[in-house]
Amino acid sequence: MASILLTPYYSKHILEAFNSLWGRTALILFLFVVLACSWSIAPYGMQLGMVGKYFKLIYLPVLAVGFTNPKTRKWCLNGYLFAIFITCVVSILKSIQIIQSFDPGEVFYNHIITGFMTGLGAYLAGLFAFQSKGWLRVLYSLLVLLTSYQVLFINSGRTGYVLYFILMGLLLFQQISFKRAVVGVLLLCGMFTAVYEVSPILQERTSDLIKDIKQLQAHNPNTSIGYRIQFHNYAKSLWLAHPFTGIGTGGFKYSFSLDKPVPAWGDTLNDPHSQYWMTLSEHGLIGMILLILFLGSLFITSMELTETRPVLLGILVAFCIGSVSDTILCYSTAGYLLVVMSALCFGELIEKRTSDTIAESNFDILPDNNSGNPIHA
């Protein structure tokens, strides 16, 4: 960040980045979070803590300027895939007990985020496999197999399963014809059915889901899904109390500690396990509209991209899916991933506009070729 701000070549484009559609929506969303502190009942420490979690939005325009070099973008994406490769290797070593671990699918943060990032890694590896030739295509294809194995045979995060399926479907529809993509999705469904028959962890997590649903039907809400539903319902009650502005930044955690709405859980909960309910409860309809505008600006701008459009669409779809069951913009490394990947993609846009500006400037200073022609004298 400091090197970008202090380097004249990069810093001259920062104002342009902030003045873009995505730069403005990110800034407005952050400023509204700051403004929402004025009506929050939470202690100042909690308010500042939440403001800090949204501050990553300000990184987006600044980081985008640092990704104007295509080689930098390429190295960054391949660096991410290398990190996912290491993650898969560590996960496999855990699964065969070479590295002792309670949950082999949890390599960093938790199994949900590990599955999220590995599923995205499978998508990116598949994208590069389509775009590459020769040994590189083979290498990326092998990485697709490795990441698929981690998600479907080791990871215990159900979000990862859903994300993997949707991203692979998205990849097919982007890279091949519609008819072939439909056939590919049908084959993907068949693959999931076959994997279910041979994957103990997939069977176990599906069985857990069915058990949770049965427990809910038996009026026992204190299960994995039941807790989430209770958290969502509590966030909904906070939102309905202040539908337009919410209860203010940091208000969810503080209100939960006072009300203790889920006795079996206790009095400490940072978030309602949903970015959408978190936004509605703390910042109301206004905050939700601003969040949708921010995400919408990313999608709209993706249509202007060429090289990195599939990358941005992939992380955007992954974020929107993950936000249903987790507060990933605030309380997850996936929030940083959205910002960094979006910035990487928008670096292409800044590069294009800079090149166009230089080309126009060079054209304007060209001498009039007809000035010395006697016919036109």
Residue locations for each model-derived region?
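Transmembrane signal-anchor hairpin modules in multi-pass inner-membrane enzymes, especially those
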Residues: 1-35, 41, 45, 68-74, ...
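Membrane-embedded alpha-helical segments of multi-pass membrane proteins
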Residues: 1-10, 50-62, 113-122, 161-169, ...
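Alpha-helical transmembrane segments of multi-pass inner-membrane proteins
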Residues: 2, 62, 72-100, 109-176, ...
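Transmembrane alpha-helices of multi-pass inner-membrane enzymes
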Residues: 2-5, 194, 312-322, 328-368, ...
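Aromatic-anchored transmembrane helix interface
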Residues: 22-31, 43-66, 84, 88, ...
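Hydrophobic transmembrane alpha-helices and their immediate junctions
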Residues: 25, 178, 282-317
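A membrane-periplasm/extracellular boundary helix in multi-pass inner-membrane enzymes
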Residues: 175-219, 233-241, 249
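Long extracytoplasmic/lumenal interhelical loops at the membrane interface
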Residues: 218-233, 237-241, 245-283
